[in-house]
Amino acid sequence: VESAHVKSTFAESTRSRRTIIPASGYYEWKGRRPFYFSPEMESTALAMAGLYSWRRPSAASLWQLTATILTCPAVDGPATVHDRMPLLVPAGMTSEWLDPSIDGARLLAPMRKAGAELSARLHFHEVAPTEGDGPSLIRPINREEPMRLF
């Protein structure tokens, strides 16, 4: 997020092609150990700040929709696992973030501050290595001795 508004790859999308990527949670790794981050209430979705663009590699190619999730420096609990985290869009900023008439560059700093407050309240736990698919992937691992994060 620190450079999205100036990097040629993302600058135009930051200005007017912004999206929200909903998620029930996300994975992050500390070394080879996966962790799962989720909101306090299971019925609440995370609103991750995203950018999108359309590209066409050649005149003979079909148009392709591309998207990316913006990240920012991790804070609080997420920082104990990884140095980056998804930028979360607070409910009060959703309309502004999605409004293409507003230059997104001016929204990044206030959203980063408000999003950090949301991220600080995330629940997280270690999970088994991600193999396969299904709800079992987010079940906490029961360890006999507590894991040390530092």
Label every PLM stretch briefly.
Residues 1-150:
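A structured binding-face within diverse protein domains that lines the active/interaction site
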